[in-house]
Amino acid sequence: WLFGHTMETRLYTLPLNIILYMIASIAGVVLVHIALDNISKFIKEGLMKDRFNFENESFEQCEEKVENEYSVNIPMRYYYKGKFRKGWISVSNCFRGTWVVGTPGSGKTFSIIEPFIRQHSAKGFAMVVYDYKFPTLATKLYYHYKKNEKLGRVPQGCKFNMINFVDVEYSRRVNPIQAKYINNLAAASETAETLLESLQKGKKEGGGGSDQFFQTSAVNFLAACIYFFVNYEREPYDANGKPLYAERQQDPQTKFWKPTGIVRDREGGNIVEPAYWLGKYSDMPHILSFLNESYQTIFEVLETDNEVAPLLGPFQTAFKNKAMEQLEGMIGTLRVYTSRLATKESYWIFHRDGDDFDLKVSDPKNPSYLLIANDPEMESIIGALNALILNRLVTRVNTGQG
């Protein structure tokens, strides 16, 4: 109906009202586009002027410096609305962890790592810095240490220590294989696993259950050796490193003399509490040398410790059955990898008599800066040695012992 008249007119079988509706719809769409085009002429913000962001414009960033006693504040510049502006990257809670990702040469050290070192040193933090390309970070860390020590910002008694397996003349010595760092068999197993995984860095995963069996066997055997040497003929020491006297009694099973738990001062004979215990051969050089002994000698020595005896079951069975191929598969893998660690530098740094500092770097009574140096050309060897130190250090700090 249109003005009271029926619309019976048709055009190619289409009613006239449908045709008028289509014409009106098309005209409406055209008019809307014309209106939007006219509106865009009044917008002066340059809409779609740089649709592919060739100017590298970013979003509006934080321009307020949020600072507290733990924060790290990194200045920055960003481009927004046609001009460069200044802002701040404020890491208010560093204890949550900060993950820095970037390609080589992208400026990670300059933009993130160095501000962390500079500001944490000024705020009196103890630090552990892993210098991947020594001395890139070593010189900066030592500079800020001396600067803030002069200004009185470094905690009193804080020392600067360095571990360097390449230029040992710069290095101090430390012994991570001792009872104060490895106090049970689980800690020995974790240490052994960390060391072997670091030596096998870059090896492709896979190989089935047989490879996993030999890998686990190597870890268990190394853990047994570590724990044996940590506890073999342990002697007590006081906080100053002076030896104390431990009363002993004979074990009826092994016929060995073992401590009773009573410790006395050598001078006055008074009962005292030792600061730590140290095995007679408790260090990495003795363990590496021990692994090169004959199987019979190794088993005869390790069997004297009842705590490590359960780990030796598969090895002793293979040895008694003269399954030398299986035994070589279980222990030979360990010997091949650990033989690469037997260098004069590692023997000197890890020797029992050269424990120059404690890995409790965050101890309020004895804080320190520790720089661990690395050389990319010898990373496969040095990285494993450094991993051994870091494993014991991180475990000690995270358990509240540091």
For the regions a protein language model found, what residue spans apply to each?
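P-loop NTPase motor domains
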Residues: 44-48, 91-402
